[in-house]
Amino acid sequence: MVAAANAVKGNSETVNYKAIPSCVYTEPEVSGVGVTEDELKANGTPYHVGRFEFRALGKAKAIGKLQGFIKVMTDEDDTIIGASLVGPHVTDLLTELSLAVGLGLKAKDVGKVIHAHPSLSEGLMEAIHDIHGECV
């Protein structure tokens, strides 16, 4: 769509390929966006990581799907640069993190978003809070 709009309207927009979500529809689902922790380690890039396990989520307990995790990586300036998710409905949860990577949002700001309780999306909030040692 970006290429078509550029051609038709004379725009010069670019695509941020790091913000394109990756989804695998297996059981459990797997999804990610941005850089992976392995890439950061291999490149020697300084980063921070927050992690949250599905087994600690009330909604995961209610639906009987306790396996999985959400991992969020930031750079030294607290900008969200990547996320890896494994678990129930993580392909649906990825949108918020794709937005954060695409717009260069800070983890502290995204962590202020109120998430419904009980919901699987609370895991996103908790993983982000874990980056700052504020996980419940």
Regions found by a protein language model. Give the residues of each.
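Conserved core segment of the aminotransferase class I/II
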Residues: 1-5
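Flexible, glycine-rich terminal cap/loop adjacent to redox cofactors
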Residues: 6-11, 20, 25-136
